[in-house]
Swiss-Prot record:
GO molecular function: rRNA binding; structural constituent of ribosome
HAMAP family cross-referenced by the UniProt entry: Ribosomal_uS17_B
Top-level taxon of origin: Bacteria
Protein name in UniProt: Small ribosomal subunit protein uS17
Protein role: One of the primary rRNA binding proteins, it binds specifically to the 5'-end of 16S ribosomal RNA.
Pfam families noted in UniProt: Ribosomal_S17
Family: Belongs to the universal ribosomal protein uS17 family.
UniProt keyword terms in alphabetical order: Ribonucleoprotein, Ribosomal protein, RNA-binding, rRNA-binding
Subunit structure: Part of the 30S ribosomal subunit.
Length: 83
């Protein structure tokens, strides 16, 4: 049995209004099939923040984990920069 490394992404906290949960916006660039121009696309993820230490505007690293609720299957690894 080999252990797979969890997927980690970096994003910006856009909401921390829930208890022990943050919303993280992750930006990625996608190439337009028609024009060939790169377009920014954002994905919003719900992540588990056990100690409620994140604030809106923080840049954080989150990793994938087991489902903790219907929409929350990421957890906070560390805060890269504080807002």
């Amino acid at each position: 049995m080999t252990e797979q490394s969890s997927r980690t992404v970096q994003g910006r906290v856009v909401s921390n209004k829930m208890d022990k949960t943050i919303t993280v916006a992750v930006e990625r660039k996608v190439k337009s099939p028609i024009y060939g121009k790169f377009i920014k696309r954002t994905t919003k993820l719900h992540a588990h923040d056990e100690t409620n230490q994140c604030n809106t505007g923080d840049v954080v690293t989150v990793r994938e984990c087991r489902p903790m609720s219907k929409s929350k299957n990421w957890m906070l690894v560390d805060i890269v920069t504080k807002a």
